[in-house]
């Protein structure tokens, strides 16, 4: 999605449609949806719930696609992917972004799985990357190696 489409779909047309549905159904409709593609994480940070659940909880690509498809029908074009570590499912997220080019996907990530291939534009996709690098503080990580990896990833 290019910036102009993001502004139009996510912040103007989509927002106006969400407001229309709020009035029509007399309920609060979100303008952004958050979902966790996976509970898996490559780090084990102190205090983080993901370390307790391991990698058992995963949304299938079909479930993620259904969430976005139904959200778009409601005028929602902004999706925040958290986890676990969402880049553990980066291929599915690339596929999702390529399929839903009128939506934007914001990844809340520790950044340690971002490599050169991740940063290259995807063929057939107009998506631009929106990342929030969650680096935390050194004392929050369970190991010095995890802290260094997270701190140097960006």
Question: PLM ranges: what are they?
Answer:
Residues 1-52, 72:
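N-terminal pre-core extensions flanking Radical SAM catalytic domains
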Residues 13-17, 62, 66, 152:
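Short, contiguous clusters of charged residues that form electrostatic/catalytic patches at enzyme active sites
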Residues 41, 59-68:
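Short cysteine/histidine-rich metal-coordination sites, predominantly Zn2+-binding motifs
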Residues 50-58, 143-149:
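Short glycine-enriched, charge-decorated loop/helix-capping segments at active-site entrances
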Residues 56, 88-89:
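Secondary-structure boundary/capping motif
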Residues 65-81, 89-154:
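Radical SAM/AdoMet-radical enzyme domain recognition
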């Amino acid at each position: 999605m290019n910036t102009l489409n993001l502004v139009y779909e996510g912040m103007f047309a989509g927002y106006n449609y969400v407001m229309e549905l709020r009035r029509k159904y007399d309920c609060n409709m979100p303008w952004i949806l958050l979902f966790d593609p996976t509970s898996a994480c490559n780090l084990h940070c102190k205090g983080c719930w993901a370390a307790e659940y391991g990698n058992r909880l995963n949304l299938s690509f079909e479930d993620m696609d259904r969430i976005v498809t139904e959200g778009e029908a409601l005028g929602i074009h902004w999706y925040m992917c958290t986890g676990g570590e969402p880049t553990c499912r980066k291929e599915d997220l690339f596929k999702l972004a390529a399929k839903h080019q009128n939506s934007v996907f914001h990844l809340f990530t520790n950044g340690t799985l971002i490599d050169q291939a991740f940063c290259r534009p995807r063929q057939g996709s107009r998506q631009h990357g929106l990342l929030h690098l969650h680096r935390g503080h050194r004392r929050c990580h369970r190991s010095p190696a995890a802290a260094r990896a997270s701190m140097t990833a960006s």
